[in-house]
UniProtKB/Swiss-Prot annotation:
SUPFAM superfamilies documented for this protein: Sigma3 and sigma4 domains of RNA polymerase sigma factors (SSF88659)
NCBIfam families on file: PRK00118.1-4, PRK00118.1-6, YlxM
Top-level taxon in the UniProt lineage: Bacteria
Function: Might take part in the signal recognition particle (SRP) pathway. This is inferred from the conservation of its genetic proximity to ftsY/ffh. May be a regulatory protein.
InterPro entries xref list: RNA_pol_sigma_r3/r4-like (IPR013324), UPF0122 (IPR007394), UPF0122_fam_protein (IPR054831), WH-like_DNA-bd_sf (IPR036388)
Name of this protein: UPF0122 protein Exig_1902
UniProt similarity note: Belongs to the UPF0122 family.
Length: 106
């Protein structure tokens, strides 16, 4: 698994975790955030490794569908890019205070 995919999944989990079931949330959190192996998750929940794998793959697909429809991560990336561009401009100090406040909201 590539670092880019892991980072993307971490963001998608952050944005859409409330749309997941508790079991999906647990599996994804352990796999992506806590770096558990499929076997470790299977042992933790007393299920087969294949069951964990299937659940994670289905949940990844769901998260990608949520992102395709809602676009929260894409919008976040666009805002971050625009804020970075604003910081590079020669603006009055009051504008930089406002930019910093906007960054705190992210």
């Amino acid at each position: 698994m590539t670092l880019d995919k892991t980072n993307r999944m971490n963001y998608l989990i952050d944005f859409y975790q409330e749309l997941l079931t508790p079991k999906q949330r647990n599996y994804m959190s352990l796999y992506y955030l806590d770096d558990f192996s499929l076997g470790e998750i299977a042992d933790e929940f007393e299920v087969s490794r294949q069951a964990v794998y299937d659940n994670i793959k289905r949940t990844e697909a769901m998260l990608e569908q949520y992102e395709e429809r809602l676009g929260l991560f894409a919008k976040y990336e666009q805002r971050k890019l625009l804020l970075d561009q604003l910081k590079q401009l020669d603006l009055p100090s009051e504008a930089h205070v406002t930019i910093a406040a906007l960054e705190q909201l992210e």
